[in-house]
């Protein structure tokens, strides 16, 4: 079990500890619990979906990287598949606040990058800020997404974001977590291929500036993130943050990044290059290359 979970794990009931210890102790645990594993825990502990998600919140919050605020937020997203995805806030010393990742963004993007096609609900230990409410409004679940908070009845995103503005107001029909293929040709080494594959599935209906980032750590592991645009623009999540999110939830250290590849279209209306380079430099990685997208 990763050391970061030990304090939160100690607060769980003995029965839940017994049920979840094998999952957390698995060498390949990467911050998500499969539908089959979740069903087993629920059956063993007599919990429903909502109760299990709430009990997992301290474990999700333990994944937070919050050197600026010292305020750990955890989220658990439940995919339509039944898989549970951890999310936690991330902050980066030496970068701007605009580069931070909110826990809800973390959980949603985690599910998306793992291939989930839609969310049934999300459970958070603190009320979602307006930024996150707007971010979640880009999802294909729309305002019907169920949000659960401690001490409150479950409510929809529409309850927390009345009179919302979203992709449908801009006649966008392909929503976040919908399956997409931009026809980008794969090429290069494994890290470059991962960045291109991420760009191929990115969500950029407003700018058309598809992009993906792939990171390689000291262990040789590769983590790739996709650009997730938002109808309100500012809540958009850059591809680097998606990759950093997977790396962190996978139990690796941000200081272990050795190489980075950004794949983006030449001559696009916007570029991720400067912001990605600045954030990576703050994390100690200066080996960033940019490769163009080529259509098949």
Swiss-Prot record:
The alphabetical list of record keywords is: Hydrolase, Metal-binding, Zinc
* Record domain CMP/dCMP-type deaminase: where: 48-168, 186-296
Q: Which cofactor does it need?
A: Zn(2+)
Chain positions recorded as Zn(2+) binding sites: 102, 129, 132
- Any Gene Ontology CC annotation: cytosol
Q: What class of enzyme is it?
A: hydrolase
EC number in record? 3.5.4.5
Q: Which Gene3D superfamilies match?
A: Cytidine Deaminase, domain 2
Q: Could you tell me which InterPro entries the record lists for this protein? A: APOBEC/CMP_deaminase_Zn-bd, CMP_dCMP_dom, Cyd/dCyd_deaminase_Zn-bd, Cyt/Deoxycyt_deaminase, Cyt_deam_dimer, Cytidine_deaminase-like, Cytidine_deaminase_bacteria
GO function terms (MF aspect): cytidine deaminase activity; identical protein binding; zinc ion binding
Q: Which reaction does it catalyse?
A: cytidine + H2O + H(+) = uridine + NH4(+); 2'-deoxycytidine + H2O + H(+) = 2'-deoxyuridine + NH4(+)
- Residues bound to substrate are 89-91
Under Pfam families, the record lists:
dCMP_cyt_deam_1 (PF00383), dCMP_cyt_deam_2 (PF08211)
Say if the entry is tagged with keyword Methyltransferase: no
Instruction: State if Ribonucleoprotein is listed as a keyword.
Output: no
Question: What is the residue range of the signal peptide feature?
Answer: none
Q: Which processes are annotated in GO (biological process)?
A: cytidine deamination
CDD domains the UniProt entry points to: cytidine_deaminase
Sorted alphabetically, which SUPFAM superfamilies does this protein's record hold?
A: Cytidine deaminase-like (SSF53927)
Family affiliation: Belongs to the cytidine and deoxycytidylate deaminase family.
Oligomeric and partner information: Homodimer.
Protein role: This enzyme scavenges exogenous and endogenous cytidine and 2'-deoxycytidine for UMP synthesis.
The molecule here is called Cytidine deaminase
Source organism of the structure: Erwinia tasmaniensis (strain DSM 17950 / CFBP 7177 / CIP 109463 / NCPPB 4357 / Et1/99)
Q: Which gene encodes it?
A: cdd
